[in-house]
Amino acid sequence: MPCCLWAALSLLLAVVGAGAWTPPRQPLLLTPRHRRHAQETHHLRLLGWDLKLKENKAIRSPYYKECQFFTGRVLHEEGSAVTVTECDGQLYGLLQVGGEEFVLQPTRTQEKHVLRRRDVTHSERSAEYNLTGDTVIDLDLDFDEDDDLLPTSHVHPRHSDHSDKEYFHDMHLFRRPASGVKGLWLELAIVADNTMLKFHGRERVKHYILALMNIVSAIFNDPSLGSNITLVINKLFLYEDKDIILKYGNIKKSLEAINKWNYRHLMKLPEGSTGWDATIWLTRSQLGGPSGFAPVGGVCTKTRSAAIDRDEGLTSAFVIAHELAHLLGLTHDGEGNCQSEALRGSVMAPTVLATLHNFAWSSCSKEQFHAKSKKWWCLHERSTDEGVELGGAKELSNYVFTMDEQCRTEFGEGFSVCRSVKVRSACSRLWCAHRAMPHVCRSKRAPPLEGTPCGQNQWCVDRVCEPMPGHSKETKVENKHTPEWGDWEEWSACNADCGYGLRTRTRKCKYRGFVSESACEGAGSQVATCWAGSSCAATRDIRSDLCHRQQSRLIPYLHANESNHCEISCVDYAGGSPTNFGALPDGTPCSYLRPFDVCFQGTCVKGQCNSSDTTCNWCPDGYCNNNTNTYTRLLGNGWTRMTMVPHEARQLSIHIATPIPLHIALRERKRDKPILELSKHSKKFDISSLQDNYLKYDPSVPQNLQIVEMDSNILDLKESFRYEGEAITAGTLLRWNQTDTDIYITSESRLQTDLMIMAIPVNPTLEDAVSVDASVNYSTPTGRTRPLEYRWSIERGPCSASCGGGVRLITAQCHRDQKCPPPRYESCNTHSCEFVWASDDWEECSSTCGSNGVQERQLFCVPSNASMLSRREFIKHSVSPVMCSSSKPPHRQPCNRIPCPVYWREQPWTPCSASCGRGVSRRPLTCPASDELLCGPKPRERRRRCRLRRCPSALRVAVQCPERDHAHYCELFTLEQLHRNCEVPPFRKYCCNACRDADRRQHRRYG
């Protein structure tokens, strides 16, 4: 680095440390504003640097016409780059010199600027956006003339008569240099629906969208992509009324609808306007799928160039960049390549993990970007339309969003910055809390935006709260009116009837004689766990019930991160990724091991075990029943039951030693419970990379003594991997690790149902049975002892008669024949010796109508003198049917023999009436009865339009074309793209030969 730059840097640090730098009174840009021309060169002296600037004529700014844009370099500094924006005498600039970045910004004081060096640091992982399945290859669009898909906008789109020439009007040919595209222009239309305006406000939403898209521009201009791409906002649509475009809950239908909307807007543009290359539709509504959805490779087309994104705060910029990349043709990382970069959170990873300080494009994305860029013919030149150009620099935002506004944007209504927890720096991470629960703070693990106010005359710069230019650190002046907290009120009653619940208390903030909700620092309410006084009876697992309500095959899933323990997470029995269904109800235990920790508004409130609670204090004196069992099982080719663990078992440990690889499964002893295979919920680990010793359980040692043997040779040295996993079943969390020779299954909390352990060989083609050893150890609470009770042992002899009344002898046995009572007799079999048929109630009819309905009843042979009123008495006194007469009462009779109503039935849609072009498809109606009069009046058949491929035209096939097409890119289009684009006359003119060849192939296909 030259010596003059060192001097400049030294002076720079001195200026930054001393405060703001005041430029000369004369304008920094030498040419007055009204006399600027694109070919003129401007010089700006900045400390020891000489900035050579040139106005960028291609940049248009209809929304902020008072701004002008310049680009250039620092003289005598190789590889330098400068971007400067002037808005009413205020300068915003980004300087890249010697591998470092410097930001030039105005202060709040007029005619004062500050220059800062950016030291970008890496932040922690951000919130996750799972975008798996966020793409579609083709869309099913049907453009009917009577469709009304253009709702009235308060930022009106431009309309004109329909013209097919507008999309290719004044299109200049562009030949891509061999070294790559030198510059790309991606012109965008941004649509914000009524949910965006309702949340952000009509005036504020414009600034918010520009700030959001500035972040997107910075992502695309990151050095890891090497794109040299410029984003231009060509059109901004704001809809105040609820639109009819989005199909809420069906993201694919919504994507098809907005692409149809986009097509109609492009077709209605005035002649001479090229429109835009892609459209971003922003909404805060639930999409019913990923946070974004886009057609792959749809840019530069009219029918597939729109993407939909859900606004979840400024971090949604990474989702927008992700979907824009899909429109450009980029695919997900990890789909065959760049798996490691996807796991680190690249922009095109299926699960996006990124922050404003930590994002990068993978090598696969970079390779795809530059390989596909030659096909983006619409991006090779800037149009003549007006638009807001986004430079991609990471300078501080021009529009200041306070921390409260950022919290509301990220988490929703009612959220503001958390004030109940003291943090070292408010700029290191954005913490937010809801006004109903101010003591519970949440974060998406990202810092506030650059330039966010963090105190009086202070703002956030590189995650540090620093004084604004022109201000130094000020000491706080003692205020006579200091807000003060009042005393805490009494705790509320425990909200649980049994077990553990929650109680709350509040305090009020007093300021200037009034009660204030925000003047005092700290929390105005507290929540704590409480003991209701008695344990609850055996209850069901609420997590299992909630997952079962969503789908019968779902079981609970417990995240490794404790901060997510109060979320309803479920996973399929057959494995796969967990799905989140919101927060658990208040009062639900946070985990299975600590039932005294209780969930409240999605956050776990820690508690303590009550000494009288038998759920957690189940072994108070240390004397518990320890159960140890060993088994040897012979395995065949099917599932074999290894053992059955009873409910109420705690501290469970199972060890299975096997000579062959096994599949292990768990099954609750309940009806209709599917088998849970451990292999479907396991992860593979490389043993050679692990340095842990493995626990070898000795079944002869009671587990409650917690004695284990450390043995590093328990695994066969030939094995190179093992499997680990966990799952929730039988109301407890089970963990396991498995190799080809050993399986360990453990659980600490109580089993709510009996649990069956089963095994099957991995390769079930055994000729001989294989012997497998299993040891099971668990503990149960010691039952209460009862006082000794001594009773006589009574024996009854046989009855002297089988019916009609008899007697039998009763004798008593006692110890050593002492104090034995004398024998006695009792009557027996007093029922009559005559038996009759008794009938039960008629059952329900087998049909509600028709000619086949029958109903049945059950017959019993019972004594004639028995008085029985219930079915239970019939069964108790019934005897063999041979004791009754052969003439039985009827046990079956016809019922509901009435005609059934019949209705007209719709048949499947008929094929299209035309083999090509437009036609009609109908849905016939049939009457299932023999006479159509029984079905009533025949309703009108439903009809719909259908359209197949365009009918081939002999005139088009025979059309005369020049020797070569006018445009070099015609040969790059696929056959499907040619079928669509050749409908536009200007395109057919430029690509005459390509369109004629496509018509001939289609003519041969249909001919």
Swiss-Prot record:
SUPFAM superfamilies: Metalloproteases ('zincins'), catalytic domain, TSP-1 type 1 repeat. Glycans are attached at residues 130, 228, 561, 610, 626, 737, 777, 865. Zn(2+) binds at residues 322, 326, 332. Disulfide bonds join 338-364, 494-530, 498-536, 509-520, 912-946, 916-951, 927-935. Its main location: secreted. GO terms for cellular component: extracellular matrix; extracellular region. It comes from Bombyx mori. This is A disintegrin and metalloproteinase with thrombospondin motifs 1. Induction: Expression is strongly induced in hemocytes during pupal ecdysis, and at a lower level during 4th ecdysis and pupal stage. Induced by 20-hydroxyecdysone in a concentration-dependent manner in the cultured wing imaginal disks, but not in fat bodies, of day 5 fifth larval instar. A motif (Metal-binding) lies at residues 322-333. GO terms for molecular function: metalloendopeptidase activity; zinc ion binding. Residues 482-537, 833-899, 900-952 form the TSP type-1 domain. Residues 184-370 form the Peptidase M12B domain.
